[in-house]
């Protein structure tokens, strides 16, 4: 026994409490949802542990949560007979936030209360939400399997510190008493509390009971009335479940405040029997890019909770999917290691992956506006799909959205089906360009001929795009073609060159040889091009060579890569090229050629190895 001690909250807890009390006040009734949700989790954990140790039930296997209030003392109590906590667990769970990235998350919070409320909601406030309506919270708990004298008392005013002490508690589980702030008497009203519980907790499998007091023969008789359906929502028939119930269940399992964009509820019977309920959130979780954070579904086996974040059932590129799977084919004592090597798991993963992709395809078809919300939140994650899941590339490709020259907007709204439907007669390929930004892609000289011919080009500017396009090779039988790479199909688009122009071009052949001699092995090849209308020169790469954006990706990852060898393509009709060709002075000629090459490299890469030399060269030529 350690006796009473007063401890300081972890600094992040203090910050979270302050933000939460101010940001969530307009939605304060959610504290009851959060506390009942925690009680439900405690019951799930007890059921799971009792599979291997039935003695943990201590002769009481009827799990429930009870809500009562004391109007005289202005307290509201939520009590469960779930797994309970020992002293160390109380300190870990109620005094600290054991989530990586918490500090940076809190630092990102600002003064925008609506935004803060959403962010805190997706962070998952849980127990601390009690302080929205209470100025003091008392907890009495005992872990299942411990003796009565190992109970723990915890109390705090939600400011800088809390008190923890040893107590005797005969029954296992956790009892949380909220000492309500002035003006919160609404939560001492029987009808009000019932309506909140019905609204938020009808879907959970744990019975929620409210205290009833009746006068009989001059005595007060206390009884407990169940006020929720207490049937796991996913086990009910879809036809019986209202949208509001699906939305509330999502908020319960995802600890999110906003409704999901869509969901898919399915029961499968036959070779494998399982029920899945999958949701697509409306906003990305704050820690979606945190590599330490686990993403996955809740796993139930025959309606018994087994684990959170079972990541084996969903590929990484669909890690935003929330929900659960309830399998009849896995053993109750299943572990993460068993899941890793299970044929059942692999089959379920394949089925759930297809189900999620179908759900997204349906959303895109039925509600373009909602799908655009999804794309803005999760498009970058979905773009990991072609590299990760070769078996579903066609399905993933249908879900991708791009900016393009057709829309003249940086918004990524164009689907590949849209693009193919607008292809010109005789066009065989889907043209795209990758660049560091939308502006750089849109203004690239590589687009000049295609714009002139009215051929649409997809404008890709996310860092992942170049990598993705290595795995996205075709769609609907049409190959993808980077316009920054040498390609006959683009060259064929150029207008037929008349005899006079051919003669003029032939006369310039010695100029090409002079350029080759000057540049040597700094470029792979020098040649004329008819791709350009306004630009004097560009650099391209061969189809099988590494492109500029891929080289940048490797460099950003700290890997040394061989230098990209460019093809230097000159526009024979451009006045600057003609001037360079007419220059006989070798020093002056060198300046013109170097300027044209630097311009081309700057347009392609966005940077030069020696920008100062480029500036000097431009200034010298301007002074003429």
From Swiss-Prot:
Source species, domain of life: Bacteria
Region of interest (B), ranges: 337-552
Start and end residues of each stretch annotated as A: 1-336
Protein's cellular compartments: Cytoplasm
GO cellular component entries: cytoplasm
Keyword Nucleotide-binding carried by entry: yes
Nucleotide-binding listed as a keyword: yes
Any GO molecular function: ATP hydrolysis activity
Subunit text: Homodimer.
General function of this protein: Molecular chaperone. Has ATPase activity.
Family to which the UniProt record says this protein belongs: Belongs to the heat shock protein 90 family.
Stated name of the protein: Chaperone protein HtpG
Organism: Enterobacter sp. (strain 638)
Name of the gene: htpG
């Amino acid at each position: 026994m350690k006796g009473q001690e007063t401890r300081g909250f972890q600094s992040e807890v203090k910050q979270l409490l302050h933000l939460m009390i101010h940001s969530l006040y307009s939605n304060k009734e959610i504290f009851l949802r959060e506390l009942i949700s925690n009680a439900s989790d405690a019951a799930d954990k007890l059921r799971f542990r009792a599979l291997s140790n039935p003695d943990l039930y201590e002769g009481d296997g009827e799990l429930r949560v009870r809500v009562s209030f004391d109007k005289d003392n202005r307290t509201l109590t939520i009590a469960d007979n779930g797994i309970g906590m020992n002293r160390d667990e109380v300190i870990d769970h109620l005094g600290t936030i054991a989530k990586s990235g918490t500090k940076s998350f809190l630092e990102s919070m600002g003064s925008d209360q609506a935004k803060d409320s959403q962010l805190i909601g997706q962070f998952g406030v849980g127990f601390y939400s009690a302080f929205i309506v209470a100025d003091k919270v008392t907890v009495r708990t005992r872990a299942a399997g411990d003796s009565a004298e190992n109970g723990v008392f915890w109390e705090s005013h939600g400011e800088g510190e809390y008190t923890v002490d040893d107590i005797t508690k005969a029954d296992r589980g956790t009892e949380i008493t909220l000492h309500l702030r002035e003006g919160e008497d609404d939560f001492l009203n029987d009808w009000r509390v019932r309506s909140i519980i019905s609204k938020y907790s009808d879907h959970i499998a744990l019975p929620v009971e409210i205290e009833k007091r009746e006068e009989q023969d001059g005595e007060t008789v206390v009884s407990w009335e169940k006020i929720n359906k207490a049937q796991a929502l996913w086990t009910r028939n879809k036809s019986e479940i209202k949208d509001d119930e699906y939305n509330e269940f999502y908020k319960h399992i995802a600890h999110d405040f906003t409704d999901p964009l869509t969901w898919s509820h399915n029961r499968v019977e036959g070779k494998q029997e399982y029920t899945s309920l999958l949701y697509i959130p409306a906003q990305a979780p704050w820690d979606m890019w945190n590599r330490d954070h686990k993403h996955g579904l809740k796993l139930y086996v025959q309606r018994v909770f087994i684990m959170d974040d079972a990541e084996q059932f969903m590929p990484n590129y669909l890690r935003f999917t929330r929900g659960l799977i309830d399998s009849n084919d896995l053993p109750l004592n299943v572990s993460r290691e068993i899941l890793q090597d299970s044929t059942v798991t692999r089959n379920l993963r394949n089925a759930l992956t297809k189900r999620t992709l179908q759900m997204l395809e349906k959303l895109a078809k039925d509600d373009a506006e909602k799908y655009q919300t999804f794309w803005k939140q999760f498009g970058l994650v979905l773009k990991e799909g072609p590299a990760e899941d070769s078996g579903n590339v066609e399905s993933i490709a249908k879900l991708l959205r791009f900016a393009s020259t057709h829309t003249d907007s940086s918004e990524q709204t164009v689907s590949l089906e849209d693009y193919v439907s607008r292809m010109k007669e005789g066009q065989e390929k889907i043209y795209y360009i990758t660049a560091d930004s939308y502006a750089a892609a849109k203004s690239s000289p590589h687009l000049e001929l295609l714009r002139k011919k009215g051929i649409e080009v997809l404008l890709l500017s996310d860092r992942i795009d170049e990598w993705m396009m290595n795995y996205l090779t075709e769609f609907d039988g049409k190959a993808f073609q980077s316009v920054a790479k040498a390609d006959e199909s683009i060259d064929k688009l150029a207008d037929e060159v008349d005899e006079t122009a051919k003669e003029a071009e032939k006369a310039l052949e010695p100029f090409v040889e002079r350029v080759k001699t000057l540049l040597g092995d700094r470029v792979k090849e020098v040649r004329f091009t008819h791709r350009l209308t306004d630009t004097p020169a560009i650099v391209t790469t061969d189809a099988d060579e590494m492109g500029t954006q891929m080289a940048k990706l490797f460099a950003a990852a700290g890997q040394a890569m061989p230098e990209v060898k460019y093809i230097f393509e000159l526009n024979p009709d451009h006045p600057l090229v003609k001037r360079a060709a007419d220059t006989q002075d070798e020093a002056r000629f060198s300046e013109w050629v170097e300027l044209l090459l630097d311009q081309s490299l700057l347009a392609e890469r966005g940077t030069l190895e020696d920008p100062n030399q480029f500036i000097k060269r431009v200034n010298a030529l301007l002074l003429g």
